[in-house]
Amino acid sequence: MSEKKKTINAFMLIVLLFGLISLFTAYPLSNGDEGFHMAKSYSMFSETFPRETSEKRLREIELIAISQPKQISIRKFYGEKIKSVANDGIKFNVLTDQNLTSKIDVGHFFPAIGILIGRLIYPSYGVMLFSARLFNLIFFLGGMYLIFRRAKFDHLIFLMIFTVPFMQKIASPSYDIFAFLAVAAFGTNFLYLSQLKKVSDVRKE
């Protein structure tokens, strides 16, 4: 096994372990605007847009979840079935975001799939959030692995250090994961291109 592959595998293992710890131990809706991201993700595959999954309602629950002392019931959060969610149909909706150049929100796609699968398994806040976190973690790991494979060995340390500040977000439904992967991919290509003497040296891969 090459030195580069060993380095990649070791780092991915560390990220996986950190992500799994965060997945199971991070308090519900406490990982940076999770109420907002959960509401956006849910709406991507919703037919009736239940009030219980609206941004307003999830923000209210998030405020309770991050308050001191903690006032949210973990058992109820995971175990209580939401009737309106159980009765909701599945319809794909294109989400928009005026802050994006394309105006189309693609950053919530993977957590949206996670929430959809979560509500099909058991329509509770906890199960949906757990599934969304899991899918974003898988997306992050897969994306970073592909980026690392394409990167030169001397760029890996830079990318790994760059990853550290975002570690707390890798198991959350946030669109920050999508943005981070885009920036990491851009950084990898930029570092590669900056070392070329002429444009014709660009590898055709």
Predicted feature locations:
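Transmembrane-helix motifs of polytopic, lipid-linked glycan transferases
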Residues: 130-153, 185
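Aromatic- and kink-enriched transmembrane "portal" helix at the membrane-lumen/periplasm boundary
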Residues: 101, 105-109, 124-133, 140, ...
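Membrane-embedded helix bundles of polyisoprenyl
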Residues: 15, 137, 154-170, 177-194, ...
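Hydrophobic transmembrane alpha-helices
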Residues: 115, 144-149, 183-196
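Transmembrane-helix signature of polytopic, membrane-embedded enzymes
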Residues: 6, 123-126, 145-165
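Start-transfer (signal-anchor) and selected internal transmembrane alpha helices
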Residues: 1-22, 29
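Membrane-interface junctions at the ends of membrane-embedded or membrane-associated helices
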Residues: 1-5, 191-205
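Interfacial juxtamembrane loops and adjacent helix segments
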Residues: 46-131
